[in-house]
Amino acid sequence: ISGRIRLEELHYAAQHNEYEEADDVYQSFGDVAKEEGFMEVASAFYQIAKIEKIHGDRFGKLAELLKTGAYFECQEGEKWMCLNCGHIHSGLKVPGVCPVCRHERGYFIPVSLAPYLMECE
């Protein structure tokens, strides 16, 4: 797509930023707090650094899934949820558009990744 940033590129950029926060920002905050004798504060910053690393890992995984096209396909039957209207679609692939609200396939996520997991029939 000429002149447009691809979604996976944004996720790779987000991964980079999360790793930077983990390795530089919160790690250094923790080091300063530790040097100044604030051990509890230092511990909190070190824990936040670990969380930021996990965020980076997740952005990277999502970028790879988008890049390969695997995000919108699966080997076994999957249930997909439209984040706009809540429609649940069953199948190996996400439809091009939601049959209910007509939003693009990018609004679908696997039900297993939905913010509030509910039993689907």
Residue spans for each PLM region:
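Non-heme di-metal
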Residues: 1-121
